[in-house]
Amino acid sequence: MDSLRSNGAPIHVTAYDTEGSVLKVREALTDTAFRKHNAIIAPDNASQLAILAEYGKNNNVKVFNTFLVRDKSYLTNPSVMHGNLPSALMYRKATDALMERLSYSTPVFVSFKGENGDKAEFVSALKQSLTDKGNTFMNIEVDGRLESADLRALPTDGNYTFIPTSSRQADLNRIMPGIIEWRDEAVTPMVRLFGYPEWTTFRGETLDNMHNLNTTVYSRFYTHEDAPRTHDIDAKYKKWYGNRMENAVPRQGLLGFDTGMFVIPYLLHEASSYDGVQNGYFFTTAGDGAGSYNDALYFINFRPGNIIEKSRI
């Protein structure tokens, strides 16, 4: 609220504890004070969201779905604002953006013998895009752990983007040391690593190796812990509440901050975009008679020297 005082209008925020109960939600809808609100930030429960979405549709009240990524009510309800880029659209957008970056690089897909990677859908879509455009790519299947010897067939004057078929940290740790060793031995090749939203949670040696390999990942959100805006909000949070904000991924405190910083100006000025500390909001209409969804997606580049760059796709 402290950051929203300059918006030029009084702000009234009410919090309701649904207690995980549909009955509590229905009870809230009968409250005279509740019916004066212009927007609802819905809870993380599908049944409760459905009730609120129907209320929003019948009363011309925007219902903001921040938590339920797989919910599809925005497709048929003009009052629902879907706060996350839907998965199918996320894969397509990430694939299209990556294709531009692969213009001068050979993609090398790395998988493990006898193991199914958890990113088969994304990898399949990317390979299809490469094939459609006539771009070549390579597949390397390794047994247990990638060794530098597994890469010796690659010309050392090449430019390569390694793409694991798994997002799991244990699998990434079985891949990166071998790539680093091969690159350092070969001296000349240009090497990058491309990966997944889950990688933004990795720390320690895994993160160090990601920086070493100039790694880029796609993600709906990211918090740069050392950014001045992050430090400023952390300091204000501790001042107001006495404790440090919970450090999770995503950070729920920052999610609340960014959501408030978007929703209030949206109600006042119909602003459809906001580039937040952690979450960005760039809404687009899903079609005639439909609601809208958040189109925000980012590339996070972990560069050598512990440099982190966040850019909107």
Question: What spans do the regions from the language model cover?
Answer:
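Structural motif
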Residues: P10-T32, G144-L154
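Signal peptide-proximal N-terminal region
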Residues: M1-V13
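Periplasmic-binding protein-like
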Residues: R35-N45, F64-T66, T106-K113, D157-M176, ...
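Glycine-rich, charge-decorated loop segments at or immediately adjacent to ligand/cofactor-binding or catalytic sites
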Residues: Y74-M81, L146-R152, W199-L213
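Segments of small-molecule ligand-sensing domains
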Residues: N243-G253, G260-R312
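Extracellular/periplasmic periplasmic-binding protein-like sensory domains
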Residues: I175-G253
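Extracellular/periplasmic Venus flytrap/periplasmic-binding protein
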Residues: M81-M176
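Extracytoplasmic ligand/sensor domains, especially the bilobed periplasmic-binding protein
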Residues: I41-A42, A46-S103, E115-F122
